[in-house]
């Protein structure tokens, strides 16, 4: 009995071990540097070139501005806000192309562990949660979409949001939910925040009304608290959302202006 409890308690270690074995099998050529994990053109042309551009100009001392061209020129580094991008830059421009596989693997482990935590928080047995987490990160959707760096990040943030929602519902821990929403707003685009906000609302309605059987004032209290958390998160994100909204509505596609 004691041994089985220990196995159940530390089943997340088996998740990490199994993932490590599978990753060595699937990504060995990328890990040893024989091939570069720049599979899609978007990753090779957009993200890689953007990071190289940042490395070329980051030493000028003013963020978003470089004096390397004439009297100076602005550079948009707003898309490099995720902290793991800083991890990529630490290895320099010459080694940058070798780091993308590690960037991908870190996101895989984060997504798997967070999804595992979310499943166990829902009351699912830990061994079953291990299988669920493996299916989550080795699904066809994750593998295909991982060729674009931002898409794989969605899996991490979705798992974090699900875990944060359950922490709020079960432990009344609202801080983690605010962190999850803020990360969604800063690391992804505006429409991601809208889509996941609607999904969060639907999840809240279904969970509180059908699963916990909350009715009346208690039901609306939870809905109101979730709305308040969303408002606080949006206020924190105002510095990013307001310029993005203005840019969206002033674009030719939205304003119906032909270019």
Each language-model region and where it sits:
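Start-transfer (signal-anchor) and selected internal transmembrane alpha helices
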Residues: 1-28, 221-230
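Membrane-interface starts of transmembrane alpha-helices
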Residues: 7-14, 92-99, 103, 124-132
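Membrane-embedded helix bundles of polyisoprenyl
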Residues: 19, 109-122, 126-210, 225-245, ...
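Membrane-interface coil-to-helix junctions
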Residues: 20-112, 134-155, 259
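Membrane-interface extramembranous regions at the lipid-water interface
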Residues: 60, 167-171, 217, 221
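Juxtamembrane loop-helix boundary motifs flanking transmembrane segments in multi-pass membrane proteins
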Residues: 94, 214-215, 219
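Membrane-proximal helix-loop-helix interfaces that form the catalytic/acceptor-binding platform
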Residues: 249-259
């Amino acid at each position: 009995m004691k041994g089985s409890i220990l196995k159940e308690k530390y089943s997340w270690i088996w998740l990490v071990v199994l993932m490590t074995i599978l990753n060595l099998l699937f990504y060995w050529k990328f890990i040893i540097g024989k091939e570069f994990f720049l599979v899609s053109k978007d990753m090779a042309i957009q993200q890689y070139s953007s990071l190289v551009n940042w490395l070329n100009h980051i030493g000028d001392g003013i963020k978003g501005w470089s004096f390397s061209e004439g009297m100076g020129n602005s550079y948009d580094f707003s898309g490099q806000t995720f902290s793991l991008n800083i991890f990529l830059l630490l290895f320099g421009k010459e080694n940058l192309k070798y780091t993308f596989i590690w960037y991908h693997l870190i996101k895989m482990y984060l997504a798997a562990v967070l999804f595992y935590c979310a499943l166990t928080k829902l009351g699912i047995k830990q061994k079953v949660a291990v299988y669920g987490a493996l299916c989550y990160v080795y699904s066809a959707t994750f593998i295909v979409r991982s060729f674009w760096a931002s898409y794989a990040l969605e899996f991490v943030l979705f798992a974090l949001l699900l875990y944060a929602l359950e922490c709020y519902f079960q432990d009344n821990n609202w801080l983690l939910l605010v962190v999850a929403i803020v990360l969604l707003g800063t690391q992804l685009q505006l429409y991601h925040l809208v889509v996941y906000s609607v999904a969060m609302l639907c999840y809240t309605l279904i969970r509180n009304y059908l699963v916990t059987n909350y009715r009346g004032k208690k039901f609306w209290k939870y809905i109101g608290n979730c709305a308040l958390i969303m408002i606080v998160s949006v206020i924190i994100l105002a510095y990013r959302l307001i310029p993005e909204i203005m840019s969206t509505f002033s674009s030719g596609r939205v304003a119906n202006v032909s270019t």
